[in-house]
Amino acid sequence: MELFHHIKSVRDALGKARAAGKTVGFVPTMGNLHNAHLALVQQAKQHCDVVIVSIFVNRLQFGLNEDWDKYPRTLQDDAAKLREIGCDYLFCPEEGEVYPNGMDAQTRVIVPSMANVLCGASRPGHFEGVTTVVTKLFNIVQPDIAVFGIKDYQQLAIIRRMVEDLCIPVEIMAGDIVREADGLAMSSRNGFITAQERPRANQLNQSLNWVKQAILDGRRDFDVLESEAKKQIETAGFRPDYLSISNSKTLEPAANDDTDITVLGAMYTEAARLIDNVSLSVVN
């Protein structure tokens, strides 16, 4: 596996790969890799000749009171994991390489219809930071395929919309959620869950699945279902951020006649904010 810190090195290596007729798969990450990240890399390997992973803790997508400075930097371990599963290239730029003119002067990419709801409502500017850095990474790597995890469903939907709107020639693939044995979605932020909270930390997943089953059983009182699910989370000792029954494509509140629905939620533990989602198809 080759390790790059500079854009020119990435472009040179991938240019040679393309000249040899190879397809390029890309998995952008912020590092602190776990099995869910590695599954995305393996998925990219199944569909492309060479795979590049980026590790960049993007300060532009963190809010003022968020955990950018606390986000784990584990490059040595991450590189070892990627090398073990056969990743071809690892791109780890410094902030000045990605934002040479500084973040305040950086041109921004915004998906206005989807970025200010759900996670975007409680994390203003977050998705603007995501779409800006992903656009830059797409321009650097120019992948044939990019793989994003379904756990970050809103991010996935926004990236798909951005690629469509800006005519970016990349296929976006979705990687399934990887879960712990009790249903908790794997996340780098799970390390902030306390030992006392951990046995109850799967409550968000349980409440989302409870809503899913209720809809499949015929309930269409979506507002009531959302409120009841939030109460379940509160009863378990956590603070719900949001729980929304949404149209899977637009992320707008689901209508009674929608057939593709995603139930998304976020909750706060003592020191972490966890997100999760479940999707379902409804026959009306």
UniProtKB/Swiss-Prot annotation:
(R)-pantoate binds at Q61, Q155. Its EC number is 6.3.2.1. It is an enzyme of class 6 (ligase). GO terms for cellular component: cytosol. It catalyses: (R)-pantoate + beta-alanine + ATP = (R)-pantothenate + AMP + diphosphate + H(+). The active site is at H37 (proton donor). One of its GO terms (biological process) is pantothenate biosynthetic process. Pfam families: Pantoate_ligase. GO terms for molecular function: ATP binding; pantoate-beta-alanine ligase activity. ATP binds at residues 30-37, 149-152, 178, 186-189. Pathway: Cofactor biosynthesis; (R)-pantothenate biosynthesis; (R)-pantothenate from (R)-pantoate and beta-alanine: step 1/1. Its main location: cytoplasm. Beta-alanine binds at Q61. It is found in: Cytoplasm. Keywords: ATP-binding, Cytoplasm, Ligase, Nucleotide-binding, Pantothenate biosynthesis. The reaction proceeds by a bi uni uni bi ping pong mechanism. Belongs to the pantothenate synthetase family. Homodimer. HAMAP family: PanC. Catalyzes the condensation of pantoate with beta-alanine in an ATP-dependent reaction via a pantoyl-adenylate intermediate. This is Pantothenate synthetase. It comes from Saccharophagus degradans (strain 2-40 / ATCC 43961 / DSM 17024). The lineage of its organism: Bacteria, Pseudomonadati, Pseudomonadota, Gammaproteobacteria, Cellvibrionales.
